[in-house]
Amino acid sequence: MGCNEALEYARKLVASLEKHVYDPVYKGYFESCKPDWTHDPWTRGVNRLPTDEKTMNNHLHLIEAYTCLLRTDKSDFMQNKVREHLYVMLNKIVDHDIHHYFYFQARDWKPTTQEISFGHDIEGTWLMMETAEVLGEPEAMRYTKDTCMNMARACYEQGFRKEDGAMLSEYDPVTGHSSPFLSWWEQNEAVVGFLNAWEVTGEEKYLDASLKCFEFAREHFVD
């Protein structure tokens, strides 16, 4: 597939997502559909409810893909969609009181869970910054930077295990329960996210955290 073919295929895929998965009422995108694009809340095999119609993970990876396309497709349509998507994440998915993402949400963005996912939060800090940079709008960049650095600080203070360099998985602020499991991807996202926070703020603690996460991942997750 040549570059032009790939670009056209990407545009067609975006058109399908906008037609079948985009929510024109509350903005954002539904979590899942059947093969015929029929709306189908994702509950099979997981402890979720049909009201969990939107997830931050879905929006994280959609904005990652849309941002990648915007680098090549500078059309007003893509610029507007990426801007809208970024502000949905900043205004609807980030909980600015505690500087973490809401995990699962109803169609109207009401939170349906209280868990915090440190891996997704630190991942989002560099992904949203990347989106704002590609978007190239000063106000969006300022708002995104402030939000993301607050999130990075919260991840560092609450999710980064300073004694060995591990990034914790999930935490329930209501029950105080932390997941005992660690995953490779959370460590890798922490490497990138803390490195980005150091580049933005110049605070050495983030560089130290990035390096410690790297060493922890290399020691425990690389065979």
What role is predicted for each listed range?
Residues 1-223:
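Glycan-recognition and catalytic cores of secretory/periplasmic carbohydrate-active enzymes
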